[in-house]
């Protein structure tokens, strides 16, 4: 255990009874533990919620919190992390802009005795990542693919084949190449879609089916909208666009307007349950989204950090799936949930994630 971790562990053991999830009471510590939170962007609403949840939960447990957003600039995020280490934070929670760009700065953090938790996006290429907290990202992809198949009529509402032979024309989108999760989402989706593509039930008129061809740098909605516009030729000529595999809500909400002049709505998937997308789902426009309760993810992350700083072993439920190139990173995975027009109120409003007024 490093000198900094030893110091922090001693402080936290003194106040361990006060550091329970959801409890901010009890005597104050003489010296607060500190955490640096490095988030990738404010352009996606979900990351704003992530930052707010983390800051609130760490703060309620007596942590000094330093939080920075990098505005999708990998170099800026490296600088922000360097500054946090120089400030003397005891731990870092990082949602990476570029999963492979942090090796050097995290090596410096390790030398300074700083614990590191990779948050939602797996940091790759370096050994200086202690733990990973995320959702079952492959399952996200399979959910999106099955929702697409249900929406176009290949599967029924129970997930059973309808016998429809197609061919159903679809187009594929993936997330940013520098986000490890984007690859996992796409792999999960394609594992489901591949048999239907091979049998001809599904077809991709553009021919763009590899991750490299369908990736969206920076998860940019503008880039996705521009690409969708270039793909519309066959559909304006009479081929019906049955559906679009979209990896998140930002891209889904860019794709839908781009297809507006077709005169009908293709089935479009999403992820993150952002309010504009949920409103679109409620109106019957976007077909589905995948809900990931970032309150739970923040709670898991906070408990990981607390365990690390007190010398305890964080709880994990996956010790084999997430190899970042330097070794397997111990992981806690949460379960995502599909949201549709039929269940959005039960899933999102009844759980308290949103109010009825927010969704409208």
Q: Positions of the model-derived regions?
A:
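A residue-level marker of the well-folded mature domains of exported/periplasmic proteins
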Residues: 3-4, 23-360
